[in-house]
Structure formats: C-alpha cells, structure tokens
Amino acid sequence: MDEWVISENGLRYKVDFGKKQNSGLFLDMRYGRGWVQAQAKGKRILNLFAYTCGFSVAAIAGGADHVVNLDMARAALNRGRENHRLNDHDLGRVTFLGHDLFKSWAKVTRSGPYDLIIVDPPSFQKGSFMLNKDYQRVLRRLPELLEEDGQVLACMNDPALGPDFLIQHTAIEAPCLRFEQRLENPPEFPDARVDGGLKALVFKAEGLSRTGWA
C-alpha cells in the first residue's frame, strides 16, 4: 500500500492508494470541504462521523474557533491529527472523540452549542449505524446542539436514497431546520443519476431558542 500526501484547495491530506476500500479522503466531497472552509470563520463546529477529519482541516483553515470531531474509529481520528499537523494547525482548537455517537450525546452536548454541525455518516457500519433508520435518530437531536442561527451540512452517499430522504426526515425530526441548498458535486465525479450520487444538503435553524422552541 502506498501512502501519499495530496493538496486540495491549498490544504494537505494523507491518502492511501492500495488495497483499502477507502483512501483516507473522500475526493468527491471536495466542494463540501470548500463550503465548510468558506463558512467556518469564528464558529464552533461539530463534525460527526469525522473519519480522517477532512472537514475539520478545512474548518480550521477557514478560521473556525474550535472543531469537535467524533468517530468510532480511533485510527481514523489519529490520521485526522496527522492531517492537521501537515497543515501546521493549532491542535488546541481541535477535539477528537473516539466514541459511539449514540452512547456519547452528553459529551457532545457539553462542548456545544455549535454554529455548524456536519453529519456525514457511512451508509452502513456493522453493529453501529444503518443509514435508513439511524439518520433520523441523529436529526432529532440536532436542535438541542445548535446555536439559534446555526447551520447543518447533512451528507449521504447511498445510491438507493435521494435528497428527499434527508429533506423529508429533517422536516419531521427537526422542523426548525429549513432546507437551503444542495451543494454541487465536482465534475470529475459524474453520476448516471443525479439523485443517486453524493448528497450534501445545507439546512439553517429558524425559530430555535437556546431553551427550546421559540
């Protein structure tokens, strides 16, 4: 297996090209990382299912005050630390939590509230996450974690589920979140069906107060 360092939007990431299914960076999420970098200045950000912390690297580069990364895979989070170090980032502005989200809401809540929450789960993770039933469990907890005018970047890459899955379930589970836009995907990753490709959807909190619903 070969380890490489690549550059994207002026930032450096370690990737593995070889026998692993995942290289260490989802290249089709380039526009998503760019969007986060552009939004990040002065914000507290929660990065759920953080993997190797690509969103976190982009956020710190964009001037985020602090990023909390959560992922069950501690080896992936260790790679995330390496990615931050590659870019000479201050690790005092980054937290790494190697936990199961559904057993760690208290830890996540203590570090909030957040101005931006990124949700980018796997379609399936044996024993811990099934997208078509567990995404709803995440969505319903987002309002209690968000600042009053907070944003959510909700991502999904299951070809069997279109963007309406996220839009409709967000309306049910977190009605204070208004759908704003779907980010475009990079042209080097064309999809035979647009709805079957990567979905990165932006939502904005409305009518939310820090003590509950306004």
PLM-predicted stretches and their roles:
Residues M1-F26:
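Non-catalytic substrate-recognition/targeting regions of SAM-dependent transferases
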Residues G42-Y51:
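Conserved class I S-adenosyl-L-methionine
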Residues T52-A64:
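Conserved SAM-binding loop of SAM-dependent methyltransferases across substrates and taxa
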Residues H66-D71:
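Conserved SAM-binding motif I beta-strand of class I
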Residues M72-I118:
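S-adenosyl-L-methionine
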Residues Y135-E148:
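A short glycine-rich, Lys/Arg-flanked "PGG" loop and its adjoining helix->strand segment in the class I
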Residues D149-M156:
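Conserved beta-strand signature within the Rossmann-like core of class I S-adenosyl-L-methionine
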Residues I167-A214:
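Class I S-adenosyl-L-methionine
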